[in-house]
Amino acid sequence: MRIFSGLFLSFSLLGLVACGLQKTEDPNQSKTSQQQLRIAVVANGTSGGLDFIGVPQLIAQDPIFLKALKQKNIELKWEPVTTAAVATLVNESFINNKIDFAFYGNLPAVVLNATGVRTQIVVPGGVGNNVYLVVPADSPIKTIEDLKGKKIALHRGRPWEINFAQLIQSKGLKLKDFQIINLNPQAGAAALSAKSVDAFFTLSDALTLQDRHLGKIIWSSQSLSADWKMRAELWGRKTYLDQHPDTTQLLADATVRAMQWISQHQDEFQQSQTKFGQPLSVIQRESQNTSSNWQQDWSPEYQVDFLKQHYAKVIDHAVKNQLIQTPIKAEELLNAQFTRQAIQNLQPLDIQHKQGN
């Protein structure tokens, strides 16, 4: 699912860990937020207004959601973050009790929980985004094995680091087998274009590089299962979930409604995402998964076993690579009740829609 199709963001992950943040939450901290619902979201202002990427834009326009909040006298407060520093800003905002929810990726969320600030997945992110390994257009390199000892641009601490680790481990390789150059996607693309690196591991911007004849994709996750995709979810502060379950349910309902609408309006949704800078052809090809279809990609089903296994892998990677100092349990990151109830709440509305009522 493309909750965050613009997750190529800078994240000073190692700096956060090095600070040794071990902040244990005070359950009373969130009480000041009783009349507010504060959500961090990737925002883009290039279109003239403030637009949110993906699902949050639909939530912000959902009349059912907005009416319910108004009736309960709850102020909806969006906390825009730029694509330059999403994970850093989101984690800092959670730590400083400035937000209650955020749409963002798996590895930063694990790092946050290791500091003692507890969050849980309220609504899972469907199938996730594809990841790609791209080399210069005229490179003779054909496989990840051919890159052993060579320079690979990879933005460390970002969610797709997990996918890169998964790829090399599947070939019996380790990070130390490569010269990893820590570059954000913009710098990584420039480095590949200048041939100052031998490869670049990234998201759908690899398709743009290929279209411009600056690179060629030698591996992608498009034909692989959801376990190979980059994940982003709707995360909520645990103390808020415990203290305000009704408000949390309203947000979960709105998120599931948005996902349902997207699953039924592929062309319209994809066209709407072009305002954030990617060509329509790139957006369309990014979604061409061969192991699932569009409707399945946007399913909000809360697959506990799958998520537990996935986040156990993320935690293991974070521990082994010293990205976190305190191991956490994958099951503590999960909270399926809100999504499951949201799916039940959606069904009567879906029936009415089909009947034309």
Task: Go through the PLM ranges and name each one.
Residues 136-151, 242-246:
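Flexible hinge/capping segments at coil-to-helix
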Residues 15-18:
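C-terminal motif of bacterial Sec signal peptides marking the signal peptidase cleavage site
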Residues 315-357:
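Conserved C-terminal helix/tail region of periplasmic/extracytoplasmic solute-binding proteins
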Residues 103-115, 165-166, 197-217, 310:
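A ligand-binding cleft/hinge motif common to bilobed small-molecule-binding domains
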Residues 181, 186-277:
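Pocket-lining segment of extracytoplasmic ligand-binding domains
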Residues 77-92, 105, 178-193:
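Short helix-initiation/N-cap motifs at beta->coil->alpha
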Residues 43-77, 115, 167, 310-313:
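Short, polar/charged alpha-helical segment
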Residues 45-47, 244-325:
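Secondary-structure end/capping motifs
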